[in-house]
Amino acid sequence: MHLPRPPRRRSAAWAAAAFTATALAAGVMPAVAADTPSATATAKIDSSLRSAVAKGGDATFFVNLKDQADLSGAKKQKTHAAKAKAAYKELRAHAESSQKSLASFLDKGKVGHKDFWIANTVEVTGDQDLVNELAKRSDVASIIKKQKIKLDDTETSDKKVTKSRTTSAGTDSSATGDETPEWGISNIKADQVWDQYENRGEGIVIASVDTGVQYDHPDLVKQYRGNNGDGTFTNDYNFYDPSGNCPSDGTPCDNQGHGTHTMGTMVGKHGIGVAPNAKWIAAKGCESDECSPENLLAAGQWILAPTDHNGQNPRPDLAPNIVNNSWGSNDNDPFYQDILDAWNSAGIFEALAAGNDGDGTTCSTAHTPGAQASAYAVGAYDSTGKIASFSGFGPSPVDGSAKPNISAPGVAVESTFPGSSYATESGTSMATPHVAGAVALLWSAAPSLIGKIDETRALLNEGATDVDDTHCGGTAGMNNVWGDGKLDILKSIDLAPHTAATVTGKVTDKASGSALPNITVNVTDTAGVVRTVTTDGDGSYRLPLQAGTYSFSFSGYGYANGSATGVTLAAQQAFTQDIALTPTPSHKVSGTVLDVTGKALAGAKVQLNGTPLAAVTTDAQGQYSFAKVAEGSYGLVVQPAAPVLCNGVYNSTAAVGSGDLAKNVQVPNRTDNSGNSCAPATYAWIAGSKNIALSGDEDSATVALPFPVKHYGVSYSSASVTTDGLVNFLSSRVGDYSNTALPTTGVNGVKGFIAPLWDDLTLDKKSSVQTTTTGTKGSRKFAIVWNNAAYGNGTSGRATFEAVFDEATGAVTLQYKSVADKGAGATVGIANQSGTDGLQYSFNQSVIADGTAVRFTQGAK
């Protein structure tokens, strides 16, 4: 990236706007416009999309398919884990089958697309002709323009409130977490549940689809499911950021504050949260103040089947019990309906905000998705017991259903905020997490209800305090202002079936007898369902369990694992399970880290997950050392320092036994989510022989490929070459002089390309772009060569580089004969057709040496 260019090229433009995706694939311009769709087909296209593409431009939209998965089998499963697994299996299989024909159509037309399984929808970018063709398809139900969805507007106190603390970020703020509760906590009688039932949400996992969470906030860190209890964190399966705003290693973040605030109301310590001993996980479905539909869909999928931070290797068995959604839209689009149905079928209780579009009088101001009939929507009231002026009323503007379902405290709610601070905010966003936390208390106190959505809603409604306001319809007991009334979780729990046994215990050091805090206690029933609690500062734990037979396991750093098996509990039994754990010896762990070429890798970060030990950094010889590591098995993670180039993250196990451990490692090749990888290659320059008609500052030309070239699973017979060092497969473009990091979602519009040296380049009389083909059929190589390209902003020096396509392997090798600035202003890498995946070798880094090469190899996906 160099200095900004003049405004004549302020944004990228299509080189030939009349080209449709299908026309580009065929290599010809359509002679006439596509057939006008029938009235039936046109009705599938929403009006905003019709307007967006009417003038010849492109738009991004969602193609919703007619056929829907049958989730009745999932609902019939007995346990939460079984429900989630069955729902995931059915949804994935159904999407793969029903989307196959549409995907084939799009691939044939060289149209990039992103497929979702939880809502059976496909995200596509295209023009009017493509939209019309899709509308004609019999398998398509509707085509909806992509719209940004805003977070609920909240009223925030200008004053950030900081409670008295002796702890810092990353440290649990107290052993018990009890203080004078916030007004909303006492108003719904959560504090009375703590006292009367000795229940704070133990064994329940709450999730959030929001702006993220400050995971190491002192009042949230202990409850994070990714907290290993020893100072380390496992973020895979516990935090997901489809927006790409958080660090690439999966570390949770919150760049807005909304998500941290709502999470605090659910599980925060010091009287802030309703269920302070529940665990939490989160999906960052909202980039900041806005939430993109594709990120909300990805987040919705992750809730049902959590993945690693790359969105891979789904685990529906790790799905949360409850999910909070404090966001919505006032356009009355039935967005997210399929996701709500999937969550409900999987036994995941969802709480949704009724919205802040009310004025205290007007009816039908609730917003989606809370306004949908299948949603459990929450209105807001203040500390005087009055309905909030902003709270959304029913009946639903979407389907006429009664809304909200219930109301909770939502005015002047103090909770956690990024920067390890606190803020006071108002909105139905603040009311909704009161309900999510209340369900955690209910399910912890009455575990026979876990996963039973209808029964749980009925108990919440029955326990609520009626408020008579029928000006928007309804009755004194259930109306479109208050729903079933004010949340009273104590009464709901009083009404719940109390068949649970109560297990308490204390974990101590066998040698000294001292109490052991932060010991993980896993309790597994005969069906394999696991509930987890962590010991408090005094080594104690407590967990309500249904009658049955269980196995207990106890684990913590520096101690041998303990267990108790065959523990049979009767209904309402009080049972004590104490245990003393044996300290383990410590040993040295050391080794050498090598890069992908086998050379010593200096500056790499080496950490042992599952220990409280600080990470160490490799020296100039690639060596690392931990002086004392307790016996046990730990996750060994090696992260290369920037620039990482083709060096990937190493993940393995370090089993520390009876002596010192020498563990040498070689990091793997980096890969993207599609399985493409890169590696340094042997430099073997191929000179060009045939000139391409390119010249000047911004120009592009389409070249025929001598053999089919696959790019992210799609085969191409032609590609567009630009002066700015790009090979585009989707379109002939100019104006992409401002390079960006990869992947490129939402940036510049450039997608589906290879970037040998994406920079602001220009071709003068001393420059050229050429092609050449070598070898025989089956083993040919095709090179696109940029000779002596100048830098567009007057930077001294030039660049000569090429992209070489290998027919035999499908790989592409990028070679660099001479690059004056060594890539200091360029992007090198590849990106997929939707801009959602890519593999970046470098971005604005001086890492390209003359006479070097890097090869990108196709993945299996």
Annotate the PLM regions:
Residues 35-38, 86, 137-205, 218-219:
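Protease zymogen maturation seam
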Residues 231-233, 240, 367-444, 486, ...:
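Extracellular S/T/G-rich loop segment that most often corresponds to the catalytic His/Ser-adjacent loop
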Residues 514, 524-544, 600, 610-628:
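Short, acidic Ser/Thr/Gly-rich low-complexity loop/linker segments typical of extracellular
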